[in-house]
Amino acid sequence: MKDTKEIKRSPPHLLKKFAVCDIPLYDICDYNVTRERCRSLDCCFYRGVCYEKAVPIYVQVFFTLIWFVAGAFIIAVIYRVIQGTKKEKKPLLPEDSQVEILKSPTPELIPEPIPEPIPEPIPEPIREPPPPVKKTESPIEAGCCLWMKSKPAKDQPQKETAAPEPPSNPEVKKVNSGSAVPQAAP
């Protein structure tokens, strides 16, 4: 005869009575107890050890999160229902007063807006007209070199384009050469 190990299996009617545990999800309830005693402790029996039904932390956190979201949803729905009933309960005018308003409307005076004063225009500074161009000067000499005429250069003699001014002092006579010669008094 051959020696073979036989796998002992529980009969089907016993498997229905005692659940097989998924070990990672359970804690040990008690050792060396019978199946009946394990069941009376509301535990599950697996390979001679009685396991207590336990739920891991991540499953507990998941269920807590579901309860929290469901509670927030229910609170939000209740809040919206309450706000909706408050909007519906706004005081409405009775139908009699609405009919009276329609029968005899009273015109409301609408105030006309007061026109703002128009600001006065700011006067622009008066600009002096440019000096007229003399017939003897070219427009370039007249317009662009005014600063040269006001301050003659030391090495260039001043050109007289205008008529000579009469001397304010009758004793001093001005000569065309540009130098003044004092005269003796008579």
From Swiss-Prot:
The keyword RNA-binding does not apply. Coiled coil: none annotated. Residues 1-56 are extracellular. The keyword Cell division does not apply. Residues 108-133 have a biased composition (Pro residues). The chain crosses the membrane at residues 57-77. It comes from the Eukaryota. Keywords: Membrane, Transmembrane, Transmembrane helix. InterPro entries: TEX29. This is Testis-expressed protein 29. It comes from Mus musculus (Mouse).
